[in-house]
UniProtKB/Swiss-Prot annotation:
Domain of life of the native organism: Eukaryota
InterPro entries cross-referenced by the UniProt entry: Globin, Globin-like_sf, Globin/Proto, Hemoglobin_b, Hemoglobin_oxygen_transport
Keywords from the UniProt entry: Heme, Iron, Metal-binding, Oxygen transport, Transport
A single cellular component GO annotation: haptoglobin-hemoglobin complex
Tissue-wise expression: Red blood cells.
UniProt keyword annotation of Methyltransferase present: no
Assembly, per entry: Heterotetramer of two alpha chains and two beta chains.
Gene that encodes the chain: hbb1
Lineage: Eukaryota, Metazoa, Chordata, Craniata, Vertebrata
UniProt-annotated binding residues for heme b: 63, 92
Anything else known: This fish has just a single hemoglobin. It displays a weak Bohr effect that is not effector-enhanced and shows a propensity to form disulfide-linked polymers in vitro.
Family designation: Belongs to the globin family.
Protein name in UniProt: Hemoglobin subunit beta-1
Amino acid sequence: VKWTDKERAVILGIFSGLDYEDIGPKALVRCLIVYPWTQRYFGTFGNLSTPAAISGNPKIAAHGVKVLHGLDMALQHMDNIMETYADLSILHSETLHVDPDNFKLLADCLTITIAAKMGHCFTPDTQIAFHKFLAVVVSALGKQYC
C-alpha cells in the first residue's frame, strides 16, 4: 500500500487526538449491540444480554481499549501492516475462529464512533484516509483466512 504524506498526516492526526479509554469501548459496544451475532466471541465476558449490560461491562470496555491500542502497531508500521499483523491474523483465524467479516463491522463502528467524536472535523477527505487505513488493517487481519 502506498500512502501519501497527506494520508499519513490525517491518520496520525486522528489517533493523536483520541481518548483510547473513551473511543475503544464505545466502538466495541456499538459493534456488539448493532451486530449481536458478534457477541458469540465474548462468551467469557459475562452478561451481554442487553445494550445496558454490554455498555456497562468492564471486560468489554477493557477489550475495546486493547483493540484500539492494537491499531498502534499499524500506525508504527504503515508500510508493512500485512506482516505486522501476521501473528494476530493467525490468532484470530486458528485459535479464536473469528469470522473475518466481523473485522469490517468493527472497523465501521470505529469509524462512526470517531466521526461522532470529531464532528465537522471528520471531513470526507479524513474519512477517505481513515477508511483506507482500516481497510488495510482488516485485510491484514483476514490474510490467514485466504
